[in-house]
């Protein structure tokens, strides 16, 4: 499992051919995704806990929900656009597994200041490779899928940040 995570982080595109159609890796990818989101949420909590324990916990929960939302949006968009419009080959399970491995290390590093920004940029590269290799589609379409998912994640971030700021302003948090 850890070898596959490192291969995805190194952007070893041969990994995605091995993952495709293999039910063992499909179930293992759930574990990979869960571990990465939990660690990312814990790091997000620790980076802001100086502002108060409750604020840190809320930030960690928001981080976890954002990670889950981002993953789901990317997988669904990749599947819909990649298989229905572009006629790529690959099941939603194949896409889900490939994206989970590519998502892992950058998702863990994202809450860490400065390193997180670099990890976010690298996440774009690894996710693009995972989608492109799993579905067998072109770079342009892969870029579109990733950009649409980023747009959805930005909308999510603005809504959640606005709600959080409103709660903090009213003293609820």
Regions found by a protein language model. Give the residues of each.
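Low-complexity, intrinsically disordered extramembrane tails and loops of integral membrane proteins
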Residues: 1-3, 169-173
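Helix-boundary and loop/linker segments of multi-pass membrane transporters
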Residues: 18-23, 50-53, 135-136
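Buried hydrophobic packing residues in well-ordered domains
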Residues: 12, 81, 131, 144-147
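Membrane-interface segments at transmembrane-helix boundaries
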Residues: 6-8, 78-101, 132-139
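Hydrophobic alpha-helical transmembrane segments in multi-pass membrane proteins
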Residues: 28-76, 97-127, 144-171
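Low-complexity, charge- and small-residue-enriched intrinsically disordered regions
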Residues: 16-19, 128, 173
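N-terminal juxtamembrane cytosolic/stromal segments of multi-pass membrane proteins
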Residues: 1-39
């Amino acid at each position: 499992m850890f070898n596959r995570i490192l291969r995805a982080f190194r952007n070893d595109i041969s990994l995605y051919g091995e993952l495709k159609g293999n039910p063992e890796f499909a179930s293992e990818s759930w574990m990979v995704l869960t571990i990465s989101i939990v660690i990312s949420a814990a790091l997000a909590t620790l980076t802001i806990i100086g502002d108060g324990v409750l604020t840190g916990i809320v930030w960690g929960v928001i981080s976890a929900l954002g990670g889950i939302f981002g993953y789901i949006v990317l997988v669904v968009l990749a599947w819909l656009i990649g298989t229905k419009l572009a006629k790529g080959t690959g099941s939603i399970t194949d896409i889900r597994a490939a994206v989970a491995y590519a998502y892992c290390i950058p998702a863990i590093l994202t809450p860490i200041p400065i390193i997180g920004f670099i990890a976010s940029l690298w996440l774009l590269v690894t996710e693009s490779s995972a989608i492109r290799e799993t579905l067998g589609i072109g770079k342009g379409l892969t870029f579109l899928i990733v950009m649409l998912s980023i747009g959805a994640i930005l909308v999510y971030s603005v809504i959640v940040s606005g709600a959080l700021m409103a709660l903090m302003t009213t003293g609820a948090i």
